[in-house]
Amino acid sequence: SPFSAHEEKLILDLWAKVNVAACGGDALSRLLIIYPWKRRYFEHFGKMATDQDVLHNEKIQEHGKKVLASFGEAVKHLDNIQGHFAHLSKLHYEKFHVDCENFKLLGNIIIVVLGMHHPKEFTMETHAAFQKLARHVAAALSVEYY
């Protein structure tokens, strides 16, 4: 594993407290509000003309939950993140044509959301561990691109 035992403990301890639906919806909504041009990937999700549309779009909330649940799978596979995300990397590259830079952006937003939802537990050490995790997830999702 690229993570120390201490980093793994920090990640697992915080992740056990995460509300995936709330944090996932928040993270994806933030991505689409901060970077509105990213909405083009989700045009089939319906109305997203305004930030309020994004915040109240059930499909965005559901997909955010799905995305964060997938991120949570990385937590369960800290020793093989790349192998675990091989299929998703291929899918996002071949079918969805998602710019792999989005994986880094969303990873950073997930970290912000986790910090907001868990301010007490989100110490600098925990932040560093999750930053490392987000980097590994983004790299794993980008494998097919290079």
Curated annotation (Swiss-Prot):
* InterPro entries in UniProt: Globin (IPR000971), Globin-like_sf (IPR009050), Globin/Proto (IPR012292), Hemoglobin_b (IPR002337), Hemoglobin_oxygen_transport (IPR050056)
Record's miscellaneous remark: Displays a pronounced Bohr effect despite the lack of the His at position 146 conserved in the beta subunit in most other vertebrates. Shows chloride-dependent sensitivity to organophosphates like ATP and 2,3-diphosphoglycerate (DPG) but not to inositol hexaphosphate (IHP). Binds molecular CO(2), not bicarbonate as reported for other crocodilians.
Keyword vocabulary terms for this entry = Heme, Iron, Metal-binding, Oxygen transport, Transport
Where along the sequence do coiled-coil regions lie? Answer: none
The encoding gene: HBB
Q: Tell me the protein family, please.
A: Belongs to the globin family.
Organism phylogeny: Eukaryota, Metazoa, Chordata, Craniata, Vertebrata
* Pfam families, alphabetized: Globin
Top-rank taxon = Eukaryota
- One GO cellular component from the entry? blood microparticle
The residue ranges crossing the membrane are none
Name the UniProt record assigns to this protein: Hemoglobin subunit beta
Q: Which GO terms describe its molecular function?
A: haptoglobin binding; heme binding; metal ion binding; organic acid binding; oxygen binding; oxygen carrier activity; peroxidase activity
Mind telling me which PANTHER family this protein's record contains? HEMOGLOBIN FAMILY MEMBER, HEMOGLOBIN SUBUNIT EPSILON
- Provenance organism: Paleosuchus palpebrosus (Cuvier's smooth-fronted caiman)
Question: Binding of heme b: at which residues?
Answer: 63, 92
Supply the PROSITE patterns for this chain.
GLOBIN (PS01033)
- Quaternary state and partners of this protein? Heterotetramer of two alpha chains and two beta chains. When oxygenated in vitro, exists virtually only in polymeric form. When deoxygenated, forms tetramers, octamers and larger polymers.
Q: Found in which tissues?
A: Red blood cells.
